[in-house]
């Protein structure tokens, strides 16, 4: 994996002091159901603002609008801004993990943003037991203990951030937490339709239940996590961790790869049916997993498979959108940043390809900064700014994706 050389610059530019009051504009649905008022372009800084400063400004806006300042969940973040009547005491695990990933980039860039405290709060989502009598991370928290269903993909992205935290903070407890995720996987893998993980422990092998499936997200991100953990795990664990990663990768490659374009379908249901929807992040996870498997095993087919999926991903998802000639999808920016990170994983083996992909992404991000934000400094889901959807734009996950995107670009192109 590429190791970035950081050059933390002094923070130049004017910081916009933005209020979170009345941040969502009144929405008037158009014929398409998700069009509305023209987004207000934020005030342009007097001098060109570097990406690390933009990332910090975005984090500050998230803190102002989403962070909980009192009660049992103080220090956590709300799922939506404004908070909805049916929202939980704190956000679900997925958007919180996305936020921690963004904060990790700020920590790398030299900002003191409470990174360690945020990582440690993962444990408030931990459940020592549920359907499977083994510990794993639940989807919700009351500020002290975990609750909700336990998803295998959620646990994978937590694991990825715990490995990152170990690299940055050097605290061995994060490796202990990763080892527990591996045990959760060992308990969750079965041989139904081939040896792989289900989406959620509550929906294992239930034909007729659409939520009972073995998905690309759980198995792909588990592979990515396992290969990151392999680098730092105790020697006694390495053989089992590598074998599990290879097993999950092979299942995905054999069961959910579209042989026509080397992209990955969404899932295989308990009834054996394939959900053929293709999402950026699923292919991204397999790119990253393939690169790392090649780097560890030396087996060239992993790298060739990663390159094939990467090239098809660019060709399939980068197209003209809303007047922008080359544009990644305008929905689900968290999915997109996972694909982008997989392209960066590939860079040591295909620098020109990664640079091409990054140039388009950086251009999209520049447009988002100019045209795809609210007057609070928060981002719309659609970075072109053409389709405003308050029900989606208000989500913490959208802001976490923007923050991580800015941080990743700052590290890639400081």
Q: Can you annotate each of these PLM segments?
A:
Residues 217-229, 238-290:
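Active-site cradle of extracellular carbohydrate-active enzymes
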Residues 15-53:
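Bacterial Sec-dependent N-terminal signal peptides
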Residues 44-102, 106-153, 214, 301, ...:
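CBM-like carbohydrate-recognition segments
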Residues 1-19:
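Sec-dependent bacterial lipoprotein signal peptides
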Residues 113-232, 242-246:
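Extended ligand-binding groove/face enriched in aromatic
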Residues 279-297, 302-318:
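Oxyanion-binding "anion nests"
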Residues 107, 166-170, 230-237, 294, ...:
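Short coil/turn linking the two alpha-helices of tandem helical-hairpin repeats
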């Amino acid at each position: 994996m590429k190791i970035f050389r950081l050059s933390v610059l002094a923070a130049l530019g004017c910081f916009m002091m933005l209020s979170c009051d009345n941040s969502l504009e009144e929405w008037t649905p158009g014929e398409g159901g998700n069009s509305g008022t023209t987004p207000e372009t934020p005030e342009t800084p007097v001098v060109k603002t570097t990406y690390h400063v933009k990332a910090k400004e975005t984090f500050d806006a998230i803190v102002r609008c989403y962070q909980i300042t009192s009660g049992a969940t103080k220090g956590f973040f709300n799922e939506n801004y404004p908070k909805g009547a049916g929202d939980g005491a704190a956000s679900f695990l997925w958007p919180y993990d996305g936020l921690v990933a963004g904060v990790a980039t700020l920590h790398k860039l030299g900002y003191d943003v409470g990174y360690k405290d945020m990582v440690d709060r993962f444990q408030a989502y931990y459940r020592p037991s549920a359907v499977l009598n083994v510990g794993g991370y639940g989807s919700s928290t009351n500020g002290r203990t975990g609750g909700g269903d336990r998803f295998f993909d959620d646990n994978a992205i937590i694991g990825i951030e715990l490995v990152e935290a170990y690299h940055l903070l050097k605290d061995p407890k994060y490796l202990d937490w990763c080892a527990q995720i591996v045990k959760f996987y060992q308990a969750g893998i079965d041989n139904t339709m081939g040896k792989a993980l289900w989406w959620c422990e509550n929906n294992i092998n239930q034909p007729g239940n659409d939520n009972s499936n073995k998905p690309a997200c759980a198995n792909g991100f588990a592979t990515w996590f396992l290969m990151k953990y392999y680098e730092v795990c105790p020697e006694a664990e390495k053989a089992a961790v590598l074998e599990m990663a290879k097993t999950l990768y092979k299942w995905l490659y054999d069961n959910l790869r579209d042989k026509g374009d080397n992209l990955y379908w969404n899932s295989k249901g308990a009834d054996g049916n394939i959900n053929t929807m293709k999402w950026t992040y699923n292919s991204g996870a397999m790119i990253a997993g393939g690169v790392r498997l090649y780097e560890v095993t030396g087996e060239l087919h992993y790298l060739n498979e990663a390159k094939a999926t990467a090239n098809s991903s660019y060709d399939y998802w980068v197209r003209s959108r809303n007047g922008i000639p080359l544009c990644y999808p305008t929905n689900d920016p968290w999915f997109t940043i996972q694909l982008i990170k997989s392209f960066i994983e590939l860079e040591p083996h295909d620098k020109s390809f990664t640079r091409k992909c990054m140039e388009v992404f950086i251009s999209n991000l520049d447009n988002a900064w100019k045209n795809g934000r609210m007057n609070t400094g928060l981002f719309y889901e659609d970075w072109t700014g053409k389709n405003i959807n308050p029900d989606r734009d208000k989500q913490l996950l959208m802001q976490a994706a923007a923050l991580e995107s800015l941080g990743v670009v700052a590290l890639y192109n400081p």
